[in-house]
């Protein structure tokens, strides 16, 4: 069973937090980190994040041509945006549903379908993420950037589906509960022989460090 290449793209504080305890929607990284994200998603066919992340941000990051920190041009070519979860509480007024992108939904609850939402395609979660991702590959999706949140990252980790990690370490101690890999069932993740090699790294101007990891041994079996 073949799946797309899964690339986790995140910014994390030194203490492993994805967002601030109070203002979850605020980006914890700098403008330099935004350029890292911009470059990462320009190289994939699709991005995926969970319904909880969409509820917090109500939009997705679009590929841009940056002129400076405040001026940019949104590029015409954008990856497909895939949302995973229950769409029942989504609001069609959110910016996301008016952004110039193709929107796909992986519905975790087929009984709860909001037909008013502007999704181009709808899929259903099938038994495991491996099987669900295999269905996406059949649709021509070869590379997916996994953008969060923690629950979805955890689900992918539990099935050992992540092939690469692009992480920016932000020089801040934030605290709070929003860690990028939940403690729940963490010991099962450590049972995997997860060894990673550094493909590249870069110290950014803002004392942030970007590291690109890839699996040392691809344990994913195709059958």
Task: Show where each model-derived region lies.
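Enzymes that bind and transform nitrogen-containing heteroaromatic metabolites
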Residues: 1-223
């Amino acid at each position: 069973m073949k799946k797309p290449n899964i690339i986790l793209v995140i910014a994390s504080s030194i203490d492993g937090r994805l967002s601030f305890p109070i203002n979850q929607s605020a980006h914890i990284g700098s403008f330099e980190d935004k350029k890292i994200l911009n470059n990462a998603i320009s190289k994939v066919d699709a991005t995926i994040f969970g319904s909880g992340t969409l509820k917090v941000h109500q939009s997705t990051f679009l590929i841009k041509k940056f002129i400076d920190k405040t001026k940019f041009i949104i590029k015409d070519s954008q990856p497909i945006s895939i949302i995973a979860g229950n769409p029942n509480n989504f609001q069609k007024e959110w910016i996301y549903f008016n952004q110039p992108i193709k929107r796909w939904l992986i519905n975790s609850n087929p009984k709860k379908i909001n037909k008013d939402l502007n999704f181009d395609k709808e899929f259903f979660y099938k038994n495991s993420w491996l099987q669900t991702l295999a269905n996406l590959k059949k649709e021509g999706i070869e590379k997916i950037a996994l953008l969060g949140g923690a629950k979805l990252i955890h689900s992918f980790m539990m099935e050992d589906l992540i092939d690469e990690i692009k992480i920016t370490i932000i020089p801040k101690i934030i605290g709070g509960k929003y860690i990028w890999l939940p403690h729940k069932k963490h010991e099962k993740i450590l049972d995997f022989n997860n060894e990673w090699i550094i493909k590249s790294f870069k110290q950014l101007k803002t004392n942030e460090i970007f590291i690109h990891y890839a699996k040392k041994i691809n344990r994913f079996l195709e059958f």
